[in-house]
Amino acid sequence: RRTDIAEPAPAGAAAWSSNSTESITLRCGVSLPLQYTTLSHTTDAAGSTWLRVVDATPGANLETWYSVNRHPAVAVTTTRAALGSHANPVDDLGESMSDLSTVAVNPHPAPLATLESAGTEDRCDALLSALPNTLGDFTRLDAASVTASGLPAASAAWTAEGQEPVVLRCGVAPAPGYAPGAQLQQVNDIPWFEDTTLANGTTSSTWFALDREAEIAVSMPQSAGNAVIVGISSAISEHLPRA
């Protein structure tokens, strides 16, 4: 049932709840998140197109659905308990959403799409062929989908519903934030550098694999887990020689 919002209530907000653990809130007039990229999965429901973003905070049970083809944009946040057996929290909003303008909003570029190339992509073929089809919960996209996203040659991407993608580029220029003595993380025999200068307001981080004949950059959500970095490290170890 619809409930009151404590004052001062923000403009364009509404809320529904059945108990303390099952609630849904709506905001109209929000900005679309940076997680909305050319690699995003979207869902059509209630006459609109929606982006689902799962809260990756450990222990959190929230997800937010953003309307990406309406103005003003709408965000609906729900607990998973409130969803129950429903696929989404927006199916009943069709009549209300029809009052908003339909617009075409360009998504943000895919992660790493704008990184500078080092011109060493020709050394990456064996690695790209050997990369796994799955990394934890993430499934690799085919080459046509990667190209359609705007990523350049020698790129790979894996996606999972509601999460930011994992993106790999081979043959990029050295990490902008790297300097001798920087802290590195060793995974198997691959030293990785996390470049925090490339943080863009999302939950993803950018990592560079060092000491190979072509430099590798990987963007991945912080919640992706060890399966992603271990799987990629194994492929690099076997299929990309040391510098």
What are these model-predicted stretches?
Residues R1-A6, V103-G150, A243:
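N-terminal "mature-domain start" segment
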